[in-house]
Amino acid sequence: MNKQQAELLNGIALAYIGDAIYEVFVREYLLDKGLTKPAMLQKNATKFVSAKAQAKIISAMDEVDFLTEYELTYFKRGRNAHSKTTAKNTDVVTYRISTGFEAVVGILHLTQQKERLQEFWDFSLKTIEADLV
């Protein structure tokens, strides 16, 4: 997929791929930390991938103006997208913010912005790492 095609995707599609990419970052990180027991992997992964965690990261990013205008456009596209899925363990606002978070990961991945995606991951890691067991 080229950049133009990626930029035309709706927020839900961007969040769909962004969710998968972010999950891989988290799983690799946890394995690199030496976690191998499924219960510990799941417990710690949730601290990164839950809607509440992603909303916390976005809030921290907002405090320091981390997101570029380009990224904010795709965050809003994801956040404002009308999804047929409902929030499971959180409120609708938090769920929508997390969808925006995943949309940013999706657009960065699909447009091959690897360095910026790494910066996004590093910021996310720094924000959540203190909560790990």
Swiss-Prot record:
**In terms of domain of life, where is this protein from?**
Bacteria
Q: Which residues form the active site?
A: D19
Name its cellular compartments: Cytoplasm
Q: Which UniProt keywords apply?
A: Cytoplasm, Endonuclease, Hydrolase, Magnesium, Nuclease, Ribosome biogenesis, RNA-binding, rRNA processing, rRNA-binding
Name any GO cellular component annotation.
cytoplasm
The Gene Ontology terms for molecular function here are: ribonuclease III activity; rRNA binding
Q: Which cofactor does it need?
A: Mg(2+)
Gene3D superfamilies, sorted: Ribonuclease III domain
Using the UniProt record, give the first listed, main subcellular location: cytoplasm
Name one process (GO BP) from the record: rRNA processing
* Top enzyme class: hydrolase
EC number(s) stated in the UniProt entry for this protein:
3.1.26.-
- Protein name according to UniProt: Mini-ribonuclease 3
In its UniProt entry, the species of origin is given as Lactococcus lactis subsp. lactis (strain IL1403)
